[in-house]
Swiss-Prot record:
Protein name as annotated: ATP synthase F(0) complex subunit 8
Protein encoded by which gene: MT-ATP8
Gene source species: Loxigilla noctis (Lesser Antillean bullfinch)
Regions crossing the membrane: 10-32
Main localization (coarse): mitochondrion
Subunit structure: Component of the ATP synthase complex composed at least of ATP5F1A/subunit alpha, ATP5F1B/subunit beta, ATP5MC1/subunit c (homooctomer), MT-ATP6/subunit a, MT-ATP8/subunit 8, ATP5ME/subunit e, ATP5MF/subunit f, ATP5MG/subunit g, ATP5MK/subunit k, ATP5MJ/subunit j, ATP5F1C/subunit gamma, ATP5F1D/subunit delta, ATP5F1E/subunit epsilon, ATP5PF/subunit F6, ATP5PB/subunit b, ATP5PD/subunit d, ATP5PO/subunit OSCP.
Described purpose of this protein according to its UniProt entry: Subunit 8, of the mitochondrial membrane ATP synthase complex (F(1)F(0) ATP synthase or Complex V) that produces ATP from ADP in the presence of a proton gradient across the membrane which is generated by electron transport complexes of the respiratory chain. ATP synthase complex consist of a soluble F(1) head domain - the catalytic core - and a membrane F(1) domain - the membrane proton channel. These two domains are linked by a central stalk rotating inside the F(1) region and a stationary peripheral stalk.
Length: 55
């Protein structure tokens, strides 16, 4: 069964995991979120009822 032979796929999995954890992840963590969380309570918008044209 070729699925149990770790030679072809284990190195690819290990290389991609190391690439993600050592190169891509630190670059992504340096970004600052555009909308930081705030301590204000959420405000529900006040809506007006829809006026149907046939009523």
């Amino acid at each position: 069964m070729p699925q149990l032979n770790p030679h072809p796929w284990f190195f690819i999995m290990l290389a991609s995991w190391l690439t993600f954890s050592l190169i891509i992840q630190p670059k992504l963590l340096t970004f600052v979120t555009m909308n930081p969380p705030s301590n204000k309570p959420p405000i529900a918008p006040s809506t007006t009822p829809w006026t149907w044209p046939w009523t």
